[in-house]
Structures are given as structure tokens and as C-alpha cells.
């Protein structure tokens, strides 16, 4: 014995390792395409609910949410189209230069969506609970629903960003 202690792994079953490439939610997969479609759907519902309120344009936060949802819809639909085309022709987006663009675009869109959702939710609470003008006149339910769908859209695009960034960081 030389006095050094070397530990060896005991023989046993192979250790299962989890790899990001095995996930079906990274760009260019059916899971990612479904996530993009869900992002688009949540954003379009938020947009539709907000513009259905007659006086949304009188509040800056609500106008910002509408603009953020338009950006979210355009971004999600564009990326979904690219991912759908890549799947159709059998091309992988894992090593594509578009991956950096997807990560930055998802991050920027997520930040703008979150800001719009927070601002709109804050104004909806202010109008509904603090000013006491009556929510029937002020469409508080619609404002809250639009903010809720915007938060859902933000959650979905944040998921896309995290997986895309993780894939970008590990390649």
C-alpha cells in the first residue's frame, strides 16, 4: 500500500444520465412547436379580451399590454413557422445559428410580456379594489382575464427561453 486512498465506484447498475438532447421541447421538435402555438394562443386571447373592453385605450398600461401581445403573437408565429418548416424538411435546429436569435428574441419578448402583464394587473387591481368605481362600468373582469392570459403567455415563452438558452450554453 502506498498510503493513498483511492475510492472506486462499486460495480452495479449503470447510472442513467439525463441529457438535454433527449427533451422533446428544444427548438425544432414537436414539443417546441406545440409550446409556440400555446404562446400564440394565450397572447391572442389576451389581446382579444383587452381590445373588447371599450375604454382600454385610455390607460397606458393596457395599451402597452396590447402592444406586447401583438409582439408576442408575431414572434411566436414566426418561430413556430420556422420550427414547423424545419420539422417538415427534417432539419435539426440544435446546431443552427438561429438558436442565438431564438434565445435573444425569447428573452426580449418575455421581458416585455411580463412588464405588460404586471402593469395591467396592477391597474386592474387599482381600478377594481382601490378606486371603488364599480367593475361593471370599468370592465375589471376583462382586464384581469387579459392580464392572466398575458402571464400565461409569459410563462410559456420563459420556458422556451430557458430550454433554448440551456441548449445554447451546453453545445
UniProtKB/Swiss-Prot annotation:
**In the record, what lineage is assigned to the organism producing the protein?**
Eukaryota, Viridiplantae, Streptophyta, Embryophyta, Tracheophyta
Q: Which UniProt keywords apply?
A: Cell membrane, Membrane, Transmembrane, Transmembrane helix
How does this polypeptide assemble, per the annotation? Homodimer and heterodimers.
Name recorded for this polypeptide: CASP-like protein 5A2
Q: List the disulfide bonds.
A: none
Q: Which residues lie on this side of the membrane: Extracellular?
A: 61, 128-148
- Stored Pfam families: CASP_dom (PF04535)
Q: What is its main location?
A: membrane
Please report the organism this UniProt entry assigns to the protein. Pteridium aquilinum subsp. aquilinum (Bracken fern)
Q: Does the keyword ATP-binding apply?
A: no
Family indicated by similarity: Belongs to the Casparian strip membrane proteins (CASP) family.
Compartments reported by the entry:
Cell membrane
All ranges on the Cytoplasmic side of the membrane: 1-39, 83-106, 170-171
The family database entries (PANTHER family) matched by this protein are listed as:
CASP-LIKE PROTEIN 5A1, CASP-LIKE PROTEIN 5B3
Per the record, membrane topology reads:
Multi-pass membrane protein
Cellular component terms per the entry's GO annotation? plasma membrane
List all membrane-crossing ranges. Answer: 40-60, 62-82, 107-127, 149-169
UniProt keyword annotation of Nucleus present: no
